Amino acid sequence: MSARNTKSGNERDPASASRGIALLMALLALTMLTLIALSMAFVSSTEVLINDNNEKRLLQLYAAESACEEARLRIRSLLDLNLVSFTDLNRTVYLVPGSSINPTSGDETTNPYFDPNFDSTLTTSILLSELGSLKFSWTRIWPKTEIRAGYSLDDAVLTTDPVFYGFNKTQSAAKPTQYVNSGTYISSHIGSPVFLVTALAKDPAGFRQAVITDIARIPCPPLQAALFSEGSVQILGSAVFVDGNDQSALSPSSLNGLESQGDIMGDASQIHGSPLAFRFFSSYSYEMASLLKMFRPPVLRDVERLNLNIAKTGAGNYEGTGVMLGALPANGNVSQSVYVDGSLSISNSSGQGILVVNGDLTISGEFTYQGLIITNGKVSLNGTGPGIRILGALLASSVNGSQTSVLDGTINLVYDSLVIRKQFDSLLYTRIAFRDF
């Protein structure tokens, strides 16, 4: 009997096993490819959704920011019309893009543009926006309080008192800050009221963006003297007249005549003021970096953007003769606020306003000016002919505090608080804080 090759029923054909493994691997690969494709589709759709949401957010953010900017530019006229007020905190203005929008009617269920912060005790005015077809919902303008802002400035109980932006008059090197203008702050601080502006932008699909800005007029820093200098002051001759007695008949508040953190040298017989004619080695100082930041353009106009007879030197300084820094009351009465980012040397010039110089200031010849001059450097005044006549105040705060300012020739510097206040009243309101949500 011949032998046969037989296989057990439990044994597998190697070829069949290979085909099974190949099929399993193919199914696994197909599953992986399917998962990858689904993941890519999910990522792609997510990216589209994110990009779409970002685009909607940016569009609404742009609309809300533009609406806040319109409010900033209109606050002065709203004050003139008594639609908003420094003293009546209930006066509120809404700016709307169309007459069909009324944020004060109905409620959040019946009115998609209803303002949940509206209160029937408010004295409300609804005005049409000047932004034309820009799609936003409304802008609310009212005086700022802690209750309305939703946070405390000093970690205490929220109050309904007005918030101001300004300086602590009693603190040396004080920085501008917001504070509640009540209690002891009324006498210890100097500042201007803050307006809280909220703009809402919402598209038809309900996507919304709100922007809140704090807007105020830049305050005058606390003044200690008609002429204050961080460095020493050298007086040459007897024709230098400085008077800190306030020339304003409206709530006069006199200052020292001349005050210096360093020495005062020379003939001080024509220096007058109250309580002191002059004070040397004063402990008072200014935080010049904060002042420069506060006055920096666009709050003040950049000298290079004004059509003035001032040229920039190769060293980055500025020089001019016959410069008109605004117009005096007798010659047009125009206040001009100028920021010079470098040392300035001018002669035979005149003007009215606020002049801030980030460097040394040199004035020679004839010069007539009404307002406030601030320089981050030493001052050199040399008046000839009728001389240098300044009605207002001058603040010199040199970088290192060791430079000597020189007063020479014919100089007449007299303090007038009303003249200075007039220049600050002419400034546009500016944004001092911003947040969106």
Model-derived regions, located:
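Beta-strand/loop motifs with alternating small/hydrophobic and polar/acidic residues, enriched
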Residues: S2-Q234, Y415-F437
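Long, acidic/serine-threonine-rich intrinsically disordered regions with weak helical/coil propensity
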Residues: T104, E108-T110, D115, L128, ...
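Surface-exposed acidic, glycine-flexible loop patches that form ligand/cofactor-binding
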Residues: Y185-I190, I346-N348, S364-G365
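Short, hydrophobic/aromatic-rich segments at coil-to-beta transitions
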Residues: S192-T198, N333-S337, G371
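Terminal domain-start segments
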Residues: S290-A330
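Extracellular beta-sheet-rich ligand-binding/adhesion modules
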Residues: Y318, G322, A327, G332-N348, ...
